Amino acid sequence: MKETIVAQATAPGRGGIGILRVSGPLATEVAQAILGKCPKPRMADYLPFKDADGTILDQGIALYFKSPNSFTGEDVLELQGHGGQVVLDLLLKRILQIDGIRLARPGEFSEQAFLNDKFDLAQAEAIADLIDATSEQAARSALKSLQGEFSKKVNELVDSVIYLRTYVEASIDFPDEEIDFLADGKIEANLRSIINQLEDVRAEAKQGSILREGMKVVIAGRPNAGKSSLLNALAGREAAIVTDIAGTTRDVLREHIHIDGMPLHIIDTAGLRDATDEVERIGISRAWTEIEQADRIILMLDSSDPESVDLSKVRSEFLAKLPSTLPVTIVRNKIDLNGEQASESEQSGYQMISLSAQTHDGVKLLREHLKQAMGFQTGMEGGFLARRRHLDALDKAAEHLQIGLVQLTEFHAGELLAEELRLVQSYLSEITGQFTSDDLLGNIFSSFCIGK
């Protein structure tokens, strides 16, 4: 028999309204015990909520949803009372006294809904993402995921892969046919079409991941290059202390900002040099740790100092020490001191922006550059949020499609192509939960609120 669970569905603490949710086959029994009757399905009823001895604990609205026409797909009872935590705790305690009722685990209501096919795994995750959204665009994209925008794209890919698998396996099972299916070009054309289709979804998912998680951008450079001034300019407030004394910043400073809905984690670090002071050395060590973990580096140069902007020295002192895959944007700061105009250019393979963090001249250029560098498009229609596990699954699917293409075009190996397509289907299906381990489900739903 399925279990019946209960939890507070509203946030803990004081509020105008507090809601308890009961889900499972004993929901009607809870209604009889607390309300003296079970409300008609989907009809609000204003009733007293009673303790075991008949004492009225609260009064409010009771709603009953009969399976399968509920959020979880089970019988659901919602008690909407006053939002005092003491009152809600008393009512919750009373419900838990009823045999067969237990407190819900975090995310268990959503887990019930997923297991009852009310939505798929990507949609379930979108519930948590909608709650946690930190910007209007992130909230809109989470809602699109909840409505199935992401799942629809993934399911279309899965359908295309299944169709191609069927065609490939037919060519293997019927080798005596006069037509060589592997060589007639149709399979290769379909395979390349799926690869292109997947690339479009990956690009959109990458933007969705940016919206959800943000990008970590570290500002680095020599002391007194204007790193803290740039942090303040991007943050729009005096987040960091700025002086003419080199080495003022000795620890890591973090600011969370939004650029047209794109979340950025901006990190100001200690100036990089050979320090003799122990505290400054610790700060520089922490700076390098942040640099190694960054998604992008903003390398600050002092344009008023000819030695500072010598790219050959910059390359040996700094750029050569970075991971080769780490993207770098070079910023020539302090153009207000030499009369330069704000500009954007490319030098030696690096994007370079000339600006003044002091006067903010050119800061807008940097903001636009960061948006473009992250692959972010303002106001993108049909966007959805994506998690790291979604990107990983899409990346693995893309990798096996490319392997399959090689097996087809270079080795004419139908059996190996069929196996690669099977793996692609498996990775894509992990996103929506069609093929998902119990451990993964546990990790996902345990991150939800208790009442979700």
From Swiss-Prot:
Residues that, per the record, bind K(+): 224, 243, 245, 248
Cofactor entry: K(+)
Co-factor remark: Binds 1 potassium ion per subunit.
GO biological process, one term: tRNA wobble uridine modification
Assembly notes: Homodimer. Heterotetramer of two MnmE and two MnmG subunits.
Family: Belongs to the TRAFAC class TrmE-Era-EngA-EngB-Septin-like GTPase superfamily. TrmE GTPase family.
Protein name, as recorded: tRNA modification GTPase MnmE
Species per Swiss-Prot/TrEMBL record: Haemophilus influenzae (strain PittGG)
